[in-house]
């Protein structure tokens, strides 16, 4: 397999730096571009400076140039930025790995439509462990569909800007689909004041923000006389970066299509 020419969006951020480190360490990948936001004080710096390495790739805000030089773009940024990058990727036939969260349903529809022209993987969480957890939740939801209250509790660092997390929503969507519903039909986001008794048909969400928590997710199936908890905890962002590279390798075999990590891992 020839070396994958990969560009990283949000290259100066926490996740972007982890992705750059992963690409530089991968024997089958080459860092082809490092995209940062317009106005960043780090524009023009070498993308490997934070590692004490010279990559020869400078941080830039020129998405057209980045897409002209790369075959793959890995994007963990924000919805508006990702959609702008998507337009450029479509023009240059660049394959996309998208880990951005916080998309609206119409924005997600744009991503799905793009799969008719280019190959892309979109997942709120690229971790192999999280995606295996989704299969466990699918099985558990069918067994506990009656007589168990379902709550999803997630915790992240103080800098995270969206809530609930994309992973928590993905968990809720998995559970809802396994029980013949849509998440919009049954989700309850936080509780406050006099709420009355719990509606047993709902899926509750609670979000915690604090410190440097990378990402903790627990799904609670609470019955009478017992409760079952399925938990995934991320100790670092390494698992996300490795999952993103795995997604890029998967896309090497596809010219077009909209995929997620369940496809990448063969869990369908």
Curated annotation (Swiss-Prot):
Residues involved in NAD(+) binding: 10-15, 36, 99-101, 123-126
GO terms for cellular component: cytosol
InterPro entries, per database record: DapB_C (IPR022663), DapB_N (IPR000846), DapB_N_CS (IPR022664), DHDPR_bac (IPR023940), NAD(P)-bd_dom_sf (IPR036291)
EC number: 1.17.1.8
Cytoplasm recorded as keyword: yes
A GO biological process held by the record: lysine biosynthetic process via diaminopimelate
Alphabetical UniProt keywords: Amino-acid biosynthesis, Cytoplasm, Diaminopimelate biosynthesis, Lysine biosynthesis, NAD, NADP, Oxidoreductase
The keyword NAD is assigned to this record: yes
Residues at the catalytic site: 156, 160
Top EC class, one word: oxidoreductase
Binding site for NADP(+): 37
Associated pathway: Amino-acid biosynthesis; L-lysine biosynthesis via DAP pathway; (S)-tetrahydrodipicolinate from L-aspartate: step 4/4
Swiss-Prot/TrEMBL catalytic activity: (S)-2,3,4,5-tetrahydrodipicolinate + NAD(+) + H2O = (2S,4S)-4-hydroxy-2,3,4,5-tetrahydrodipicolinate + NADH + H(+); (S)-2,3,4,5-tetrahydrodipicolinate + NADP(+) + H2O = (2S,4S)-4-hydroxy-2,3,4,5-tetrahydrodipicolinate + NADPH + H(+)
Family from the record: Belongs to the DapB family.
UniProt cross-references to NCBIfam families, sorted A to Z: dapB (TIGR00036)
Protein name per Swiss-Prot or TrEMBL: 4-hydroxy-tetrahydrodipicolinate reductase
Organism the protein comes from: Burkholderia mallei (strain ATCC 23344)
């Amino acid at each position: 397999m020839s070396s994958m020419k990969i560009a990283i969006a949000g290259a100066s951020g926490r996740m972007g730096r982890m992705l750059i480190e992963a690409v530089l360490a991968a024997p089958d990948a080459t860092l082809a571009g490092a995209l940062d936001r317009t106005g960043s004080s780090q524009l023009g710096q070498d993308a490997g400076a934070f590692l004490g390495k010279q990559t020869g790739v400078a941080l830039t805000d020129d998405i057209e140039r980045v897409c002209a030089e790369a075959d793959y773009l890995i994007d963990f940024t924000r919805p508006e930025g990702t959609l702008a990058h998507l337009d450029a990727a479509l023009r240059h036939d660049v394959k996309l790995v998208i880990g951005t969260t916080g998309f609206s349903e119409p924005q997600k529809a744009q991503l799905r439509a793009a799969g008719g022209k280019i190959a892309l993987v979109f997942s709120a969480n690229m971790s192999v462990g999280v995606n295996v957890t989704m299969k466990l939740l699918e099985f558990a939801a069918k067994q506990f569909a009656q007589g168990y209250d379902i709550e999803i509790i997630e915790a992240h660092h103080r800098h995270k800007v969206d809530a609930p997390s994309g992973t928590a929503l993905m968990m809720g969507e998995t559970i809802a689909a396994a029980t013949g519903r849509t998440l919009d039909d049954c989700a309850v986001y936080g509780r406050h004041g006099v709420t009355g008794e719990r509606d047993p048909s709902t899926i509750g969400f609670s979000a915690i923000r604090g410190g440097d928590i990378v990402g903790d997710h627990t799904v609670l199936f609470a019955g009478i006389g017992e409760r079952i908890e399925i938990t995934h905890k991320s100790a670092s962002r390494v698992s996300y970066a490795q999952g993103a590279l795995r997604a890029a390798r998967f896309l090497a075999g596809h010219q077009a299509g909209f995929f997620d990590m369940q496809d990448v891992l063969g869990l369908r």
